[in-house]
A protein has these predicted regions:
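Bacterial N-terminal signal peptides
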Residues: 1-12
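Catalytic-core regions of hydrolytic enzymes
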Residues: 146-300, 309-322, 368, 377, ...
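A short, glycine/Asx- and small/polar-enriched loop/turn
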Residues: 122, 258-260, 348-353
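Flexible glycine-/small-residue-rich
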Residues: 46-48, 67-69, 104-106, 129-132, ...
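Short, solvent-exposed loop/turn elements at domain surfaces
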Residues: 53-55, 74-75, 184-188, 274, ...
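Signal-peptide-cleaved, periplasmic/extracellular N-terminal interaction regions immediately downstream
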Residues: 16-174
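Active-site-adjacent mobile loop/cap segments within catalytic or ligand-binding domains
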Residues: 305-402
Length: 402
């Protein structure tokens, strides 16, 4: 119905104009994307100012851009999946109308969409910043869209097929456990052949099982099997599920084989020491080592986002100290156990995040302990106590989920 009205309005031109030669179709000249699984920018160049409308759909998550009849001159290579966008389609959608459809990897929001006149050339460009969001917030957007566009059957279906806001029950404290590496990315490996990806998954499941006994704590995992995930995808999952805490589990190797013990890392642009810097550089290369190309991130300047990051960082520091407090005297810790560096997996602006190295596979004593299920159970118990204490202090700000 909406598309028909949109097309009709475009076709309703004065009769004096209709007597002349029809206006040529709009030309969409180029399509570009840049970003990652958290934020992606699309730029479409047009020969003249486009009149357009946009809609969001669920199942699958899509952004639909309706245009007047348009000739598309896109380079097919520019349409390859990138960042949040998994698929791009375009073409005629009825008499006098064309459509551009972006399929997204998960729930999203269009943070900023504008049509700008080109400064140094003819034509106009459409610029849209698409950001990952939670299932709840995406459902709210669909509900808001329904209110604006009327109660059509299509809109009812898309809302019904998506997670709706909370039903008034208190929202549990949500912990996202991230077993490092996986799939083609094995991570570190001990001299005896133990792979980091297997140990992190085993411990992640043990920590999940331990936390599942706590009241009002919901536990999710970025992976529950031997699956490869990009670093940004891990962060996106935490944000999609509105996690209140993100714990990434690792067990690395280091050239100095005498170094051993658990370490808790938080994010910082400046590394606390050479070991932390080297660790972050190695972990941040996980994507490229597994064959996933690094993706350019659109520059974002937002005062509110910066304030959110600062608050989140404070919570991350608080949880890191709680973990160390629970581990001291119970398991071996590295000297100065709270360290920091620029880990990509810790960069969610609104989810307190830590990376816990449970030990070093390059140290024979650590390797023996990490491989022991009883020792891992003890470690999981101590971390669970820290999570419980942190959850008691930082309950979800939106208790109703709405």
């Amino acid at each position: 119905v909406l598309l028909a009205l949109f097309c009709l309005s475009l076709a309703n031109v004065p009769s004096t104009f209709a007597a002349d030669s029809p206006a040529p179709p709009l030309s969409a000249l180029t399509f570009r994307m840049a970003g990652d699984d958290l934020r992606t920018r699309i730029v479409v160049m047009f020969d003249r100012e486009p009149k357009l409308s946009t809609r969001l759909f669920g199942n699958p998550h899509r952004l639909v851009i309706d245009l007047p009849e348009t000739r598309f001159g896109f380079d097919e290579k520019s349409l390859e999946a990138r960042g949040l966008v998994s698929h791009v389609r375009y073409g005629l959608a009825g008499k006098g109308c064309s459509r551009l459809i972006l399929t997204l990897r998960g729930p999203f929001d269009v943070e900023n969409l504008r049509v700008l006149k080109n400064e140094n050339a003819s034509g106009y460009r459409l610029v849209a910043d698409i950001v990952a969001t939670s299932d709840r917030k995406f459902a709210e957007k669909l509900k808001e869209q329904k209110g604006k566009t009327g109660s059509t059957e299509r809109t009812r279906q898309q809302v019904a097929g998506s997670a709706l806001p909370g039903d008034g029950k208190p929202r549990p404290f949500t912990v996202m456990i991230d077993p490092g590496h996986g799939g083609i990315d094995s991570g570190a490996e001990s001299l005896s052949g133990i792979k980091e990806k297997n140990l992190t998954l085993a411990f992640g499941k043990e920590l999940r099982d331990r936390l599942s006994h706590e009241r009002n704590i919901k536990v999710l995992m970025t992976r529950e099997d031997d699956t490869f995930l990009r670093l940004a995808e891990r962060v996106r999952l935490a944000r999609q599920h509105e996690a209140d805490l993100f714990i990434s589990i690792h067990a690395d190797t280091i050239n100095q084989h005498d170094i051993r013990g658990a370490t808790v890392y938080t994010i910082s642009d400046k590394a606390s020491d050479a070991v932390a810097r080297a660790m972050a550089e190695r972990e941040n290369k996980s994507d490229s080592l597994a064959g996933a190309l690094p993706e350019e991130q659109p520059e974002v300047t937002d005062i509110l986002l910066d304030l959110t990051r600062r608050e989140t960082h404070t919570f991350s520091l608080s949880f890191a100290e709680k973990v160390i407090g629970e581990l001291q005297g119970q398991v071996n810790l590295i000297n100065n156990p709270h360290r920091f560096a620029g880990f990509q997996v810790l960069r969610a602006p609104d989810v307190p995040s830590v990376l816990i190295e449970i030990g070093y596979l390059s140290n024979p004593e650590d390797e023996k302990l990490i491989s022991n299920p009883e020792w891992r159970k003890k470690l999981a118990d101590r971390i669970a106590l820290a999570v419980k204490a942190f959850a008691a202090r930082k309950r979800p700000s939106n208790l109703s989920g709405g």
